[in-house]
Regions:
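Bacterial N-terminal signal peptides that target proteins for export
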Residues: 1-7
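Extracellular beta-strand-rich solenoid/capping regions of secreted or surface-exposed proteins
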Residues: 40-43, 54-66, 75-119, 132-139, ...
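Parallel beta-helix/beta-solenoid
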Residues: 42, 62-63, 70, 87-89, ...
């Protein structure tokens, strides 16, 4: 980006932020639905979600927004679909608990589904009883950090992955706890991304799984009690340093599988 374009971008962004407002959501407030808050908010507004249980699903974000949970509010999807769907650039999600993502054999339902987005952040969330945790498709330049993602996977066919990325690039996945899933982290056609300081354990298949994903790095992660620690399949230029593999139990592979 040239200096001229960068200056214009910063000026426009600062102008938006200067006019941004905070939309308050709580069970007893005038706005007691996250969907309603998203609809009423303008681009670059902050939606502050207070403690409580919100029985909602398919909360779709089509504009730049910041969603912030206060005292860990819970979105109970009740196995009805996706939790939050992000279809815009510049979206940030933090401080939320999202539960009960139902299993499907026709759709990849996820607690947070990100598609065709840039500059997104998902951090400090708890995603429980998920099919997929954070599902990222055709998205770039994002961060997934400090999340706790878990399920109760029993068989591979009926379970999904904690962080699942497809046709994406320049994503940072760091300091997440992922367990009892199919794969903790799964990359397919993903490039120029980094995976650092994650703990991925007790997953049915792999702690970390690369498929057709080139020029990625993973460092300082721990892979414990998985079918296999890490699988690098049909992928090139993967840099791997300072990772710990322990007590992985698969019959065909243990710590690191290269194919």
């Amino acid at each position: 980006m040239s200096f001229r374009y960068l200056t214009t971008f910063l000026a426009v962004s600062i102008g938006f932020l200067a006019s941004a407002k905070t939309v308050i959501v709580c069970p007893s407030c005038e706005i007691n639905s996250i969907k309603t808050a998203v609809e009423k908010a303008d681009s670059f507004d902050r939606i502050q979600i207070s403690e409580g249980i919100y029985n909602e699903f398919d909360i779709t974000i089509n504009k730049p927004l910041e969603l912030v949970g206060i005292d860990r509010p819970t979105i109970d999807v009740q196995s009805k679909g996706y939790g939050i769907i992000i279809k815009s650039n510049n979206v940030s999600i933090s401080g939320l608990r999202i539960i009960h993502i139902g299993t499907s054999y026709t759709k990849d339902f996820a607690a947070i589904y990100i598609t065709k987005s840039k500059y997104f952040v998902v951090e400090n969330t708890e995603l429980e009883n998920v099919f997929f945790g954070v599902l990222v498709e055709k998205s770039h330049k994002g961060t997934i950090a400090n999340n706790h993602i878990s399920s109760d996977a029993v068989v591979e066919a009926g379970s999904g992955n904690g962080v699942h990325m497809w046709h994406s690039s320049h994503i940072e996945v760091k300091e997440n706890l992922l367990h009892n899933l199919r794969d903790g982290i799964y990359f397919e056609f993903v490039t120029n991304s980094t995976i650092t300081n994650n703990l991925s354990h007790h997953n049915l298949r792999y702690g970390l799984h690369f498929m057709f994903s080139n020029e990625n790095e993973y460092h300082y992660n721990t892979f414990r009690n998985n079918g296999a620690g890490v699988a690098v399949m049909f992928s090139k230029k993967i840099i791997m340093t300072h990772n710990t593999f322990t007590k992985n139990w698969g019959s065909a592979s243990y710590g690191l599988l290269l194919k």
